[in-house]
């Protein structure tokens, strides 16, 4: 696989899509914007309010904003509700499956609980959120019926003002993709939390529970539907909270774990302990939720 060149991936710019025209192209389809959130009381409100004002009230493009609160210890749920989102606790969605953990769990449950035929996911910690992110992600799906998954990418300035791809992306995701999944090397931001897809495709994918979900979905959608069914869109510039390195090591471990798991399940154990000098050890588990298409009571797509 080392000699396999990166495949081309259709690439768009958010600015090339007009929201009024997208309303016409949308037809009878419903669009849900879902935000997984944990302890994001400072940013989730403005994000929800901006989507609601621009894409529900000014232009009727989005039908639903759903925030799945992933065990927040602050006022994330209340702030999101006041801003106009439908808010559900992760624990109240599919409780018969037990309490999972992490971002992937929240995404999986948001897919179950939402009503849209097209799903847009955005991170809830973005400080300069622009509703154009949603327009850019949904635009290719409405313009090109052959696409099933659209990944966002952006300029991401670091604390020095220079644009970077993110530390975990540059130090872990990009190298492991180049080594094990070189056909995906054209994906600019493989760990970006902004992406969209058709329910009929997403409901057939397993969801890694934790931080590995972003990369896991890229790998799995490409394997099932092919790169011709995928695209990426330039969302411009995005600023979010920069976490200290000790908070990034669990994410880096989960991303590496997911990549190795997808390459060959026998390469890793189902559970690993991240040991860091001077800090408490953290267990990182390779756990995934099943495709929703097989979950009893799930609202299936019409496809």
Regions found by a protein language model. Name each.
Residues 63, 77-105, 113:
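Conserved donor nucleotide-binding strand/loop of the catalytic core
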Residues 1-53:
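N-proximal low-complexity "stem/linker" segments adjacent to membrane-targeting elements
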Residues 1-6, 243-303:
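Terminal low-complexity segments of carbohydrate-biosynthetic enzymes
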Residues 164-258:
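Conserved catalytic loops of nucleotide-sugar-dependent glycosyltransferases that act on lipid-linked
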Residues 95-103, 107-109, 129-201:
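Acceptor/aglycone-binding surface of glycosyltransferases and processive sugar-polymer synthases
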Residues 123-129:
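The conserved acidic donor/metal-binding loop of glycosyltransferases
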Residues 119:
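Short aromatic/hydrophobic "clamp" motif used to bind/position activated sugar donors
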């Amino acid at each position: 696989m080392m000699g396999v060149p990166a495949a081309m991936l259709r690439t768009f710019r958010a600015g090339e899509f007009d929201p009024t025209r997208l309303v016409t192209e949308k037809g009878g389809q419903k669009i849900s914007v879902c935000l997984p959130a944990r302890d994001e009381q400072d940013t989730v409100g403005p994000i929800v309010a901006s989507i609601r004002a621009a894409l529900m009230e000014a232009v009727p493009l989005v039908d639903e904003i759903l925030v799945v609160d992933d065990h927040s210890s602050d006022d994330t749920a209340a702030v999101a509700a006041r801003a106009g989102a439908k808010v559900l606790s992760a624990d109240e969605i599919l409780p018969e499956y037990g309490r999972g953990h992490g971002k992937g769990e929240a995404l999986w449950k948001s897919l179950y609980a939402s009503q849209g035929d097209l799903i847009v996911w955005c991170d809830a910690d973005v400080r300069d959120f622009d509703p154009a992110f949603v327009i850019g992600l949904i635009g290719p799906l409405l313009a090109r019926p052959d696409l099933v998954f659209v990944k966002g990418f952006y300029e991401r300035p670091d604390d020095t003002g220079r644009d970077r791809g993110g530390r975990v992306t540059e130090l872990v995701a990009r190298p492991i993709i180049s080594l094990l999944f070189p056909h995906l090397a054209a994906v600019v931001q493989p760990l970006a939390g902004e992406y969209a897809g058709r329910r009929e495709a997403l409901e057939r994918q397993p969801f890694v529970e934790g931080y590995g979900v972003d990369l896991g979905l890229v790998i799995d959608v490409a394997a099932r539907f092919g790169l011709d069914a995928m695209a990426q869109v330039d969302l411009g510039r995005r600023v979010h909270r920069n976490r200290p390195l000790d908070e990034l090591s669990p994410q880096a471990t989960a991303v590496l774990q997911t990549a190795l798991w997808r390459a060959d399940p026998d390469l890793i154990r189902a559970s690993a302990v991240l040991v860091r000098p001077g800090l408490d050890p953290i267990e990182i588990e390779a756990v995934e939720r099943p495709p929703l298409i097989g979950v009893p009571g799930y609202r299936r797509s019409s496809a």
